Swiss-Prot record:
Its cofactor is pyruvate. This is Phosphatidylserine decarboxylase proenzyme. The active site is at residue 206. The keyword Membrane applies. It comes from Nitrobacter winogradskyi (strain ATCC 25391 / DSM 10237 / CIP 104748 / NCIMB 11846 / Nb-255). It is a peripheral membrane protein. Belongs to the phosphatidylserine decarboxylase family. PSD-A subfamily. One of its GO terms (biological process) is phosphatidylethanolamine biosynthetic process. Its EC number is 4.1.1.65.
């Protein structure tokens, strides 16, 4: 039985709607990832030409590379005083620590929240607070396991100090790891950033440290999963103790 015009229009509308829904669920790739994804794709074509099973392995690696450099949109809470996660990953450490000398934040302990990013996490980094970037300092170093405490002093790293309007200075350090060999920063000294704004990325596994003024109320715990630009790490304005429990 022939399909009438109205039915065809209805089918076409459903297909367009479905396509929009699929596009909305697929994160775009960050431009910094194009050379890597393209390289993996080219290698995959060559592997298929050599031996098809190798080509399928290359296909999986290309998909993984595209996922690694995904650049999803995030919904960031913007209330004054909130500190959001700068990275997707897992909170590996929360402790009072004297900040590295390059931050120039003094010799008294600050609250350090460390987030470890595996090779399966999105590696686009976002500003934890709104403010003005006072300085950016790069330090070459080793590539030991980023989960180790000494990685913050020994590993290659890039440090940012952000001056907030009402809550003092906040330090953010991108730390390279065993696999990560390239830290990328998109911002510069004197630039103003918003909470959750993209400021850099680290290629292939790493860690981010956030240094907050002593006494800042931390709202997360070690082992907790974070989403960059969305998970609230701390609240400068809160003074009534913990707001979560483990279960």
């Amino acid at each position: 039985m022939p399909i009438d015009r109205q039915t065809l229009l209805s089918i076409a509308k459903s297909v367009r709607s479905g396509a929009r829904s699929v596009r909305a669920q697929i994160s775009p790739i960050h431009p910094k990832g194009y050379p890597f994804v393209g390289g993996f794709a080219l290698a995959t074509i060559i592997l298929f030409w050599i031996w098809s099973p190798l080509g399928w392995i290359g296909t999986l690696l290309t998909i993984w590379c595209a996922l690694f450099f995904r650049n999803p949109a995030r919904v960031t809470p913007i209330r004054e005083g909130l500190v959001v996660a700068p990275a997707d990953g897992r909170i590996s450490m929360i402790a009072p620590v004297v900040p590295p000398a390059e931050l120039e934040l003094g010799e008294l302990p600050m609250v350090r929240i460390s987030i470890f990013m595996s090779v399966f996490n999105c590696h686009v980094n976002r500003s934890p607070v709104a403010g003005r970037i006072e300085r950016i300092v790069y330090r070459p170093g080793k590539f030991i396991n980023a989960e180790l405490d000494k990685a913050s002093e020994d590993n290659e790293r890039n440090a940012l100090v952000i001056s907030t309007p009402n809550n003092g200075l906040v330090g953010v350090i991108q730390i390279a790891g065993l696999i990560a060999r390239r830290i990328v920063t998109f911002v510069h000294d004197g630039q103003t950033v918003e909470t959750g704004e993209r400021f850099g990325l680290i290629r292939f596994g790493s860690r981010l440290d956030v240094f907050l003024p002593e006494g800042t109320q931390v709202l997360v715990s070690e082992g907790q999963t974070t989403i960059a630009g969305e998970t609230v790490l701390a609240d400068f304005q809160q003074t009534d103790g913990r707001t979560f429990r483990s279960s």
